Amino acid sequence: MQILLAALVAYLIGSVSFAVVVSSVMGLADPRSYGSKNPGATNVLRSGNKKAAILTLVGDAFKGWIAVWLARHFGLPDVAIAWVAIAVFLGHLYPVFFRFQGGKGVATAAGVLLAVHPVLGLATALTWLIVAFFFRYSSLAALVAAVFAPVFDVFLFGMPGHNPVAWAVLAMSVLLVWRHRGNISKLLAGQESRIGDKKKAAADGGKA
């Protein structure tokens, strides 16, 4: 019952879509209506409002971090922490408050990894930054970081074995890659948007 309750709370935390909330508060168009239609920081950046994109990034990462931090703070066992990590991530992907239309989970996963172990989170974030800096593709950076996250976990803690948190990290990586399947097709076709590209979006209530 304790694990179920913790996972439910984590899912509800994850279901708060900061891309939609921040855009609404700042008078921007719903990020699900323009660009990639993904409610995430990269798509919010396409509105031309960097402040909104940063707030979205920080908010989405924070909810992943706080969910796992709270689980640790209250002394929950590793199996509960693993379920909390998965639940907050799934909440972002399929938010109950926003008709289950969520983001792809990059920032939230980063927050989870930082809470699991700061070195794991920072190593994964640095991987994202390096790829994004050289190639300017947020999706490619996310895919590479997702592949390396479980590898970093093995280097830090050894093979997963009976470690439920390590399996949760692997599960999030697989889900993140799956959520980017459309981006993979666009990357292969040379049609993927680069970081900073603006689409017809909405810094002012949906008007370009």
Swiss-Prot record:
List locations, semicolon-separated.
Answer: Cell inner membrane
Residues in the signal sequence: none
Record-linked InterPro entries: G3P_acylTferase_PlsY
The GO molecular function terms of this record are: acyl-phosphate glycerol-3-phosphate acyltransferase activity
Query: What superkingdom does the record give?
Result: Bacteria
The pathway it acts in is:
Lipid metabolism; phospholipid metabolism
Write out the GO biological process terms: phospholipid biosynthetic process
Q: Which residues cross the membrane?
A: 3-23, 51-71, 78-98, 115-135, 140-160
EC no. given is: 2.3.1.275
Quaternary organization = Probably interacts with PlsX.
Family the UniProt entry places it in: Belongs to the PlsY family.
Reported function:
Catalyzes the transfer of an acyl group from acyl-phosphate (acyl-PO(4)) to glycerol-3-phosphate (G3P) to form lysophosphatidic acid (LPA). This enzyme utilizes acyl-phosphate as fatty acyl donor, but not acyl-CoA or acyl-ACP.
Write down the HAMAP family for this protein, in alphabetical order: PlsY (MF_01043)
Q: What is this protein called?
A: Glycerol-3-phosphate acyltransferase
What is this protein's gene name?
plsY
